[in-house]
């Protein structure tokens, strides 16, 4: 409270205590956002936040808003800042109390930003702490959307004593763990607020009679628990606050203003700012809010001051403010009370800040660069070599540009010729790695080479900058832009214009250059192509700096490009007197300078604001201090330079950068080598940087000048960035290269006193070392023929010192590429680097290659501890690089499974390096230990931190809690690295950690269960009386050997791994007997015999405390249960009885894994990580799933934790699991440096369209010669407009009607957007497949059209699609540039019959039709008849639905959520687009299921019955056949060729809800074929049916063969399909023969071009067996055939017919696929029809394969 007199004085001052009755000012800082739209934004922010503590963001934003509005209020009003006075007061709630504390210690408004920053720091750390603690009580469910769960409920009209009594009774009765207790967190006169974990709050109001009958409101408290004295301690407070910097500043920050405690209403009594913040944070964490006491305290303060006027400052109105103001107004009738809203000024102010940001802008750091310069300068090192040698690299115009002999005329008399034959050119500008940049050869060839090389150099510059997308805030993809200068379009105008094609515009127009860079890297920031003629690239860089200064971007890639191919520009510049006729680059500053020499060049740099670059740990090559552009408006002509304009710009740049001209020690001049240009520029430079009058440069202030054009010519649009890269290299090399432009003598127009001015032209390489007393600062100047001038001031980058050290001694060195050629090149480049850098830090190398590089599909990863070993391994990898298989990106990363180790892996004291050296891991352990101690358990840290000897025996409760919490902390550590499980399994005690990670148990509850169980064991069981014995034998072997000896089976871990429990003496006897029988035995170091009768005394009590003290939640990912031997998905299975049984009953690890395999939850692609102190489960897993590729531990006993982790990280990386390397290195990043490593080794090929001849009009194209070439078919050809057109029916191409008969033919193009999207909405094997629902929509459309044409008066048309049979499926091709046409015909002989026939065809390239691939019969019917016919069936089907529901509640049937159902569907076969995903939940039991369906509201196209509607209600059958554990989905997949009938009596409506039911039954004729009837219900009535839907089982081996795009071989598909069909030929008619695909081998015959047909007249001659090499393809092929047919090879005699030994159409396809996979021989299954006898095939194989 303060006096507010003295109006009109600056608001930034402070006040003394006034004399007389004061006006009292009280500021209230709320704990809620103002009710403006920001509130909505922050809630949305919570919804979208995928990781990290939301409450820290919430708190930071709230503080920032309050401080900003407080400052804005006082700056825009005439009010004085009142809080410098000791009579002012502040109050606040929650985070608002932190903001209030900052205001209370601030002497003036000018000092508030510093105090505010301190408050923001504390608010952020407080939020992180609260989130971490709260997540261990109840993890936030990220899978849900909408309003998050509240941690606090307010109950009105109830006594706090009554509430507390009720809570105490509940906690006592239910034995609630202390951290999980519900508690009173706030009191007011009218209400009580209770807080706790959201699930427990919901349970309280659901189960307690007292609370259930009360009104309550969930508060918007989403971040976690505060005001919880039973959870937080003083150490938490100190962890948040640490020491405030405000106690150490020169400004006197002190707690001089009264701040009211929200728990006592009394002012905080603090001795320092740190102490005040500690009290405030302690108040928020441990004390309940009692706002009535604050109101009372305020009233007492007003009475104490005898105040007559009170002003209450608020951030909008709120309930606490209302109560306070009401109390003030009723307390004293003489007290005048006013309220001032600190947000009101925002709405009253009309002024907006305009104009530039001023000179105090951020410096701009250049953090990466790359170039392609003339004469082989393919990187910056080669460019420097060229410069330091002083080379002039001009040459004659090369033949790949144009014919210099015909296009050059030194006399200038011939029209359109060049006066000079010279230029400076990039070698082989057509070289490009098209595959790397996802460009087809055709697109690459038609794309301007300068744009291609801009893309390449941008990548290299980013690579050298250590760029990884979204690694930091400055590398957020939405905040990165590209800026490139380009002043010509030669390639488009000349080369591609000869034959204009698809990419003429996107490959040649300037805007696409930077745009393509943005698109490739997925930058969402701006992209600019800027043309200012010769200054384009430097002006572009200046524009990029402006973008950074204005905050439009945080990172920019900028540069320039120029590749010369057009003779017109040479002719034009020559005629304009710009070019030199003589053989030189540019004779810059020479007396005979007569013009410039044109040049190629590409340059790219990466820039950030300096503070961002330093925060990102970047290498800073140079720092831009200022940049500007102006125009020579007063020049004598537009092309003539103007010294005064240039000088004006220099002074402006120096002024803005706060530089003295003498600070500049080098000027890189434009220096084109023209008399006028050189003289004008020298005049401006000498005038500003080296004047002769007044102050002069001393001998210690030399100014060197240079011009790179004398070396590499004038690159025009690239000239500026070329000069800038030269200066950056000079900083790096600490040298100035020699000037090469003066061939004779110096320009006579230059000042004669250059030496007096201390201006130096370096004729030799000159040292330019870094010095401690003076920074090296350079100016780069560039001007334009169009009149512009651009100048940049740049200084050397700062030297950065490492802080701390990296304790890790083992490091991962990964190398990757997009092709094998590049992988080998990258390996060789790293070997070469290590040869010249033998002392490189491996820590820096690992950091640079992991956290600061992109990772591509071809990968190598080496774990190493020294450089010599690394080089040896690299050479080994180089030799084997050809055998590396790439990661298939399209398939996504493989699933990850966490296996949590049981107690058998425990050992005395772990002494983990992770605990000592990883702050994140240690913090997790300490937080979990705090929970354990808070529940009354002893600290388990001594079992982890090494404070006891390794052999020390801790109490069981300590050992078991240490194991649990180590595993939880390890899982969290992996999660922090971005590695999260898709499925979990826990072995014995490890299951508790697994259940926590799966979301079933909170960390607090897991600790409670394990701790209670351990205490019960200690109390009720005798330690050491029983033992556990691991035996390397199967259970059957143990039973046979042990005979009648007493024991119990504790664990079945594998086929040959069994663990037994028994009394100690019995175990000893058992071990002796088993070892005598030859079985290895190991006694486990455990105190008790788990899973045995020894645990019986604790079971009842343990189940009781588990039931009342713990909340079991639904798992958020599959849990493989070793107790049940199945996978758990639902929320009913795991409960108190489950953990009881898990304590007593056997661990059947083997059966659990087998069950998970059976339903494809795990398979050979699953990546396993063992979570525990030593790997135990890995062996069991490898035994159960022998084909798995990765099963790695987190920690290994006796091995440094980092070494184990690095090895596992390497395995994950090679498996394609994304790792957050940034997070892995974060704790040590200040000790690490980004190395300037070799850039990517490109797999370059030449893409170049040669300019031909001397053309004018035709320009050498052959378009008209090829005019008669066949055109690609178009939908419908040249036909009039179609009478119908939908998303799947595009054109009617023919129709005939004759009375009641009619035929309609339509064509559709799969490549049309809606059709294409519909196909890719049903994706199989990463291909778009035209599902039967799409065919159905076509039939409904054309069927309605046919009926309307023949019976135009009928409106109510209902159709039954019957006998649909798809004999050859339809897969969308990859190439969308050409049509993919189908034709569908519908015909009826008499519409009155109510039937029509439908046939589908593929349209061939020549416009003809292929054989029909599908047929159906259409029946027209009446909906009411259908509805009546279904009534008798309804109750039977509903009865089955209810039975399934009952089975699901009992945990017998499986219930799947929408995400889980479609996730499994996608994993096993079909990846549906979102609008196809109508099933909201599925209950599945065996081959029977029902689904609740909600159709999408989004139609997105023109449909008769949207395919995604049909699929949503019908594909439950496919879900059963491809997900159910009753089907072997690991080895087979199932697809449908059609159905008997599909009809809907009511239309399927967007957004409507339905229920589908189906039971699939194997047919008697063929066990591999299944039939079922799908019923569709709405409001318990059957409204639709798909009767007789058929599914056929096929080996998964054939998936590629059946579901590959028809053009996959041409367009980079994974496999070239041998057949067009997506539906396997086993369902085809006998007449449908698949055309053979000739095998692909190195020998000539087996190719499409020179295929050898099977002889028609005679069979191949039999071949003697002796002539066959046993290692030959033929021998291996015949062995493979024999194995598949279950025969001995000797039975395959030449006269044996394949048909007689069971090689049918299906087996032939399987054999063909195995030929391809095993032998590399690609054939069609029909080969066995062409060569029906063994001898025929053997002879064919020998002929072509040997």
From Swiss-Prot:
- Entries under Pfam families matching the protein: Acyl_transf_1, CurL-like_PKS_C, ketoacyl-synt, Ketoacyl-synt_C, PP-binding, PS-DH, SAT
Q: Which residues form the Ketosynthase family 3 (KS3) domain?
A: 361-796
The region called N-terminal acylcarrier protein transacylase domain (SAT) is annotated at 4-227
Give the induction annotation: The cluster is expressed in rice fermentation medium. Expression is correlated with the production of pestheic acid. Three regulators are located in the cluster (ptaR1, ptaR2 and ptaR3), suggesting that the production of pestheic acid is controlled by a complex regulatory mechanism.
Region: N-terminal hotdog fold; residue ranges are 1290-1425
Q: In which pathway does it act?
A: Secondary metabolite biosynthesis
Q: Which parts of this chain are annotated as the region Product template (PT) domain?
A: 1286-1605
Provide the alphabetized UniProt keywords.
Answer: Multifunctional enzyme, Phosphopantetheine, Phosphoprotein, Transferase
Q: Which InterPro entries match?
A: Ac_transferase_dom_sf, ACP-like_sf, Acyl_transferase_dom, Acyl_Trfase/lysoPLipase, Ketoacyl_synth_AS, Ketoacyl_synth_C, Ketoacyl_synth_N, Malonyl_transacylase_ACP-bd
* Catalytic residues of the enzyme: 534 (for beta-ketoacyl synthase activity), 670 (for beta-ketoacyl synthase activity), 714 (for beta-ketoacyl synthase activity), 1322 (proton acceptor), 1511 (proton donor)
Q: Which residues form the Carrier domain?
A: 1671-1745
SMART domains recorded: PKS_AT, PKS_KS, PKS_PP
Instruction: Give all O-(pantetheine 4'-phosphoryl)serine modified positions.
Output: 1705
- Taxonomically, the superkingdom here is Eukaryota
Q: Name one GO molecular function term.
A: phosphopantetheine binding
CDD domains linked? PKS (cd00833)
> What reaction is this protein's catalytic activity?
holo-[ACP] + 8 malonyl-CoA + 8 H(+) = atrochrysone carboxyl-[ACP] + 8 CO2 + 8 CoA + 2 H2O
- Any one GO BP annotation for this protein: secondary metabolite biosynthetic process
Q: Where is this region: C-terminal hotdog fold?
A: 1452-1600
Give the disruption phenotype, in one or two sentences. Totally abolishes the production of pestheic acid but does not affect the production iso-A82775C, another precursor of chloropupukeananes.
Among PANTHER family, the record links this protein to: FATTY ACID SYNTHASE (PTHR43775), SI:DKEY-61P9.11 (PTHR43775:SF37)
Protein name, as recorded: Non-reducing polyketide synthase ptaA
Source organism (scientific name): Pestalotiopsis fici (strain W106-1 / CGMCC3.15140)
- Gene from which this protein is expressed: ptaA
């Amino acid at each position: 409270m303060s006096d507010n007199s003295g109006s009109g004085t600056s608001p930034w001052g402070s006040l003394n205590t006034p004399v007389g009755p004061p006006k009292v000012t009280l500021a209230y800082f709320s704990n809620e956002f103002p009710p403006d739209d920001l509130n909505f934004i922050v809630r949305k922010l919570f919804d979208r936040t995928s990781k990290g503590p939301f409450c820290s963001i919430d708190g930071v934003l709230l503080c920032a808003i309050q401080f900003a509005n407080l400052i804005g209020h006082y700056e825009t009003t005439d009010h004085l800042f009142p809080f410098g006075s000791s009579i002012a007061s502040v109050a606040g709630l929650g985070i608002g109390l932190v903001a209030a504390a900052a205001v209370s210690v601030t002497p003036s408004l000018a000092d508030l930003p510093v105090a505010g920053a301190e408050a923001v720091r504390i608010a952020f750390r407080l939020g992180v702490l609260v989130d971490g603690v709260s997540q261990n009580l109840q993890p936030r469910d990220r899978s849900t959307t909408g309003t998050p769960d509240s941690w606090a409920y307010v109950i009105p009209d109830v006594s706090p004593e009554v509430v507390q009594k009720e809570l105490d009774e509940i906690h006592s009765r239910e034995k609630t763990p202390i951290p999980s207790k519900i508690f009173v967190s706030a009191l007011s006169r009218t209400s009580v607020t209770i807080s706790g974990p959201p699930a427990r709050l919901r349970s309280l109001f659901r189960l307690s009679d007292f609370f259930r009958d009360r009104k309550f409101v969930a508060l918007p408290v989403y971040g976690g628990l505060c005001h919880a004295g039973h959870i937080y301690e003083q150490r938490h407070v100190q962890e948040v606050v640490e020491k405030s910097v405000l106690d150490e500043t020169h400004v006197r920050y002190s707690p001089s203003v009264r701040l009211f405690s929200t728990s006592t209403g009394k002012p905080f009594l603090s001795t320092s700012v740190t102490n005040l913040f500690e009290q405030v944070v302690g108040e928020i964490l441990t004390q309940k809010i009692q706002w009535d006491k604050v109101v009372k305290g305020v009233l007492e303060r007003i009475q104490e001051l005898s105040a007559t006027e009170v002003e209450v400052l608020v951030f909008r109105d709120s309930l606490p403010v209302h109560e306070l103001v009401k109390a003030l107004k009723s307390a004293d009738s003489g007290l005048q009370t006013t309220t001032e809203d600190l947000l009101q000024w925002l709405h009253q102010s009309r002024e907006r800040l305009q104009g530039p940001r001023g000179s105090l802008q951020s410096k701009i750091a250049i953090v990466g660069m790359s170039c392609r310069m003339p004469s082989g300068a393919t990187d910056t090192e080669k460019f420097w070599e060229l410069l330091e040698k002083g080379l002039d690299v001009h040459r004659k115009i090369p033949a790949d540009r144009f014919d210099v002999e015909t296009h050059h005329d030194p006399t200038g008399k011939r029209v359109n010729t060049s006066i000079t034959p010279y230029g400076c050119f990039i070698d082989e500008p057509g070289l490009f790695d098209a595959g790397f940049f996802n460009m087809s050869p055709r697109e690459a060839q038609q794309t301007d080479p300068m744009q291609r090389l801009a893309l390449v150099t941008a990548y290299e510059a980013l690579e050298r900058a250590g760029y990884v997308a979204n690694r930091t805030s400055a590398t957020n993809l939405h905040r990165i832009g590209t800026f490139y200068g380009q002043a010509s379009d030669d390639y488009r105008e000349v080369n591609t214009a000869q034959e204009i094609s698809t990419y003429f515009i996107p490959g040649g127009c300037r805007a696409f250059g930077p745009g393509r860079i943005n698109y490739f890297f997925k930058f969402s920031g701006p992209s600019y192509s800027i043309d200012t003629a010769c200054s384009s690239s430097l002006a572009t860089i200046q524009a990029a700096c402006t973008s950074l200064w204005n905050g439009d971007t945080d990172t920019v890639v900028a540069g320039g490009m120029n590749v010369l191919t057009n003779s017109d520009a040479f002719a034009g510049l020559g005629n304009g007197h710009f070019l030199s006729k003589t053989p030189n680059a540019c004779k810059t500053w020479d007396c005979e300078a007569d013009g410039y020499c044109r040049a190629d060049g590409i340059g790219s740099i990466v820039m950030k604001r300096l503070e961002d670059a330093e925060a990102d740990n970047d290498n800073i090559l140079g720092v831009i201090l200022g940049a500007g552009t102006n125009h020579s408006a007063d020049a004598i002509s537009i092309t003539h330079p103007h010294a005064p304009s240039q000088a004006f710009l220099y002074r402006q740049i120096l002024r803005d950068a706060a530089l003295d001209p003498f600070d500049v020690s080098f000027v890189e001049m434009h220096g084109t080598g023209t008399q006028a240009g050189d003289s004008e520029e020298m005049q401006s430079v000498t005038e500003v940087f080296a004047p002769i009058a007044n102050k002069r440069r001393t001998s210690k202030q030399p100014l060197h000048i240079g011009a790179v054009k004398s070396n590499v010519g004038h690159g025009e649009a690239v000239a500026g960035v070329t000069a800038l890269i030269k200066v950056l290299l000079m900083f790096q090399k600490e040298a100035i290269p020699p000037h090469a432009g003066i061939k004779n003598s110096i320009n006579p127009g230059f000042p004669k006193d250059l030496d007096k001015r201390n201006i130096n032209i370096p004729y030799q390489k000159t040292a330019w070392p870094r010095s401690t007393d003076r920074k090296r600062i350079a100016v780069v100047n560039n001007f334009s023929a169009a009149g512009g001038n651009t100048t940049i001031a740049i200084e050397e980058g700062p030297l950065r010192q490492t802080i701390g050290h990296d304790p890790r001694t083992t490091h991962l060195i990964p190398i990757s590429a997009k092709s094998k050629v590049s992988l080998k090149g990258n390996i060789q480049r790293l070997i070469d680097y290590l040869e010249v850098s033998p002392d490189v830090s491996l820590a820096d190398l690992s950091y640079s290659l992991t956290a600061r590089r992109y990772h591509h599909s071809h990968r190598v990863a080496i774990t190493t501890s020294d450089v010599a070993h690394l080089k040896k391994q690299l050479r080994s990898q180089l030799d084997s690089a050809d055998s590396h298989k790439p990661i298939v990106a399209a398939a996504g990363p493989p699933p990850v499974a966490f296996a949590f180790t049981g107690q058998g892996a425990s050992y005395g004291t772990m002494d983990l390096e992770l605990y000592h050296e990883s702050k994140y891991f240690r913090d997790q352990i300490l937080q979990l230990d705090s929970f354990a101690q808070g529940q009354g358990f002893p600290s388990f840290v001594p079992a982890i931190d090494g404070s006891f000897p390794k052999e020390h025996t801790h109490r069981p409760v300590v050992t078991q809690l240490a194991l649990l919490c180590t595993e939880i902390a390890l899982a969290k550590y992996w999660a922090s690295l971005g590695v999260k499980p898709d499925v979990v399994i826990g072995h014995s005690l490890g299951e508790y950690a697994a259940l926590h990670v799966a979301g079933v148990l909170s960390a607090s509850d897991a600790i409670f269960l394990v701790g209670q169980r351990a205490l019960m064991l200690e109390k009720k069981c005798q330690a050491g009386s029983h033992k556990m014995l691991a035996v390397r034998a199967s259970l059957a072997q143990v039973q046979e050997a042990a005979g009648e000896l007493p024991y119990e089976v504790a664990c079945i871990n594998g086929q040959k791994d069994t663990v037994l429990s028994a009394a100690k003496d019995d175990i000893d006897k058992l071990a002796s007997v088993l070892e005598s029988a030859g079985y290895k035995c190991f006694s486990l170091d455990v105190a008790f015999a788990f899973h045995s009768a020894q645990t019986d005394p604790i079971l009842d009590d343990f189940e009781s405390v588990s039931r009342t003290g713990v909340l079991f939640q639904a798992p958020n990912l599959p849990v493989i249960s070793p107790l049940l031997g199945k996978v758990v998905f639902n929320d009913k299975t795991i409960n108190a009885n489950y953990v009881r049984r898990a304590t007593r009953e056997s661990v059947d690890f083997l059966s659990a894994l087998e069950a998970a395999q059976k339903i494809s939850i795990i398979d050979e692609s699953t990546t396993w990580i063992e979570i525990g102190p030593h790997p135990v489960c890995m062996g069991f897993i490898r035994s159960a799933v022998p084909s798995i590729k990765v099963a790695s531990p987190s920690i290994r006993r006796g091995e440094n934790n980092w070494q184990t982790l690095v090895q596992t990280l390497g395995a994950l990386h090679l498996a394609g699991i994304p790792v957050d390397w940034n997070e892995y290195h974060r704790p040590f990043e200040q000790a690490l440096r980004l190395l300037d490593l070799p850039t990517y080794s490109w797999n370059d090929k030449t893409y170049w369209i040669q300019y031909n001849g001397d053309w004018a009009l035709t320009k050498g194209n052959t378009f008209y010669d090829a005019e008669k070439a066949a055109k690609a078919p178009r939908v419908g050809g040249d036909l009039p407009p179609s009478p119908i057109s939908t998303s799947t029916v595009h054109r009617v191409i023919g129709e005939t009607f004759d009375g009641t008969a009619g035929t309609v033919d339509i064509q559709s193009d799969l490549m049309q957007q809606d059709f294409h999207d519909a196909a890719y909405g049903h994706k199989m094997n990463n291909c778009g497949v035209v599902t039967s629902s799409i065919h159905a929509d076509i039939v409904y459309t054309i069927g309605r059209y046919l009926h309307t044409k023949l019976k135009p008066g009928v409106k109510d048309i209902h159709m039954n699609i019957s006998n649909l049979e798809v004999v050859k499926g339809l897969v969308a091709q990859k190439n969308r540039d050409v049509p993919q046409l189908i034709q569908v015909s519908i015909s009826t002989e008499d519409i009155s019959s109510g039937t029509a026939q439908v046939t589908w065809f593929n349209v061939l390239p020549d416009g003809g039709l292929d054989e029909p691939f599908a047929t159906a019969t259409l029946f027209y019917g009446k909906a009411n008849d259908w509805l009546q016919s279904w009534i008798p069936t309804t109750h039977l089907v509903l009865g089955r639905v209810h039975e399934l529901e009952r089975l699901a509640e009992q945990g017998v049937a499986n219930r799947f959520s929408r995400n889980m159902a479609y996730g499994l569907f996608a994993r096993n076969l079909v990846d549906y687009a979102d609008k196809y995903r109508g099933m909201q939940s599925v209950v599945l039991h065996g081959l029977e299921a029902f689904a609740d369906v909600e159709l999408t509201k989004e139609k997105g196209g023109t449909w008769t019955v949207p395919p995604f509607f049909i699929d949503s209600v019908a594909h439950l059958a496919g879900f059963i056949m491809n997900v159910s554990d009753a089907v072997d989905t690991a080895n087979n997949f199932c697809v449908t060729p059609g159905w008997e009938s599909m009809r809907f009596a009511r239309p399927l409506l967007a957004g409507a809800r339905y229920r589908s039911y189906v039971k699939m039954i194997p047919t008697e004729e063929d066990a591999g074929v299944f039939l079922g009837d799908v019923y569709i219900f709405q409001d318990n009535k059957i409204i639709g049916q798909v009767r007789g839907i058929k599914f056929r089982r096929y080996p998964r081996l054939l998936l590629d063969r059946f579901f590959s795009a028809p053009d996959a071989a041409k367009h980079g598909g994974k496999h070239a399909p041998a057949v067009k069909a997506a539906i396997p030929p086993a369902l085809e008619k006998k007449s449908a023969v698949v055309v053979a695909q000739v095998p692909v081998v190195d020998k000539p015959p087996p190719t499409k071009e020179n295929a050898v047909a099977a002889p028609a007249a005679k069979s191949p001659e039999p071949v003697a067996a002796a002539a066959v090499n046993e290692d030959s393809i033929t021998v291996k092929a015949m062995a493979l055939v024999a194995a598949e047919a279950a025969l001995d090879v000797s039975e395959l005699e030449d006269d044996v017919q394949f048909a007689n030994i069971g090689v049918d159409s299906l087996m032939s396809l399987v054999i063909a696929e195995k030929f391809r996979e095993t032998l590399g021989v690609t054939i069609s299954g029909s080969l066995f029809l062409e060569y029906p006898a063994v001898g025929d095939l053997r002879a064919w194989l020998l002929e072509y394969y040997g």
